[in-house]
Amino acid sequence: MAGRSGDNDEGLLRACRIIRLLYQSNPYPEPAGTRQAQRNRRRRWRARQRQIHSIGERVLATCLGGPAEPVPLQLPPLERLTLDCSEDCGTSGEKGVGSPQTSGESPAVLGTGAKE
């Protein structure tokens, strides 16, 4: 693989083999039995698939040396966030009603949190 060292290639190939083996160990359930039994088998299969997916992510992160902690999402300060419904107010079925907007000033929209 271009631009990578041979050692890293071996780790990546080993990780791919492990992940492939994990997915092959959980075949789709057979369509036999009652509808309820089929539904239960599919539900359990999906739960196992989710577990395999998370294990596969961990295997890749371990073999490729990814970051241990995810990079946190940078959010604006809460003081600058306001809920302004003046532009879009309408019936509750419309989309976009009350979308959050940021402004330069920090009005006391929610108050201090103390009950009156």
Curated annotation (Swiss-Prot):
A motif (Nuclear export signal and binding to XPO1) lies at residues 73-84. One of its GO terms (cellular component) is host cell cytoplasm. The RNA-binding motif binds to the RRE, a 240 bp stem-and-loop structure present in incompletely spliced viral pre-mRNAs. This region also contains the NLS which mediates nuclear localization via KPNB1 binding and, when the N-terminal sequence is present, nucleolar targeting. These overlapping functions prevent Rev bound to RRE from undesirable return to the nucleus. When Rev binds the RRE, the NLS becomes masked while the NES remains accessible. The leucine-rich NES mediates binding to human XPO1. This is Protein Rev. Keywords: AIDS, Host cytoplasm, Host nucleus, Host-virus interaction, Methylation, mRNA transport, Phosphoprotein, RNA-binding, Transport. It is found in: Host nucleus, Host nucleolus; Host cytoplasm. The modification Phosphoserine is found at residues 5, 92, 99. Escorts unspliced or incompletely spliced viral pre-mRNAs (late transcripts) out of the nucleus of infected cells. These pre-mRNAs carry a recognition sequence called Rev responsive element (RRE) located in the env gene, that is not present in fully spliced viral mRNAs (early transcripts). This function is essential since most viral proteins are translated from unspliced or partially spliced pre-mRNAs which cannot exit the nucleus by the pathway used by fully processed cellular mRNAs. Rev itself is translated from a fully spliced mRNA that readily exits the nucleus. GO terms for biological process: mRNA transport; viral process. Its main location: host cell. Pfam families: REV.
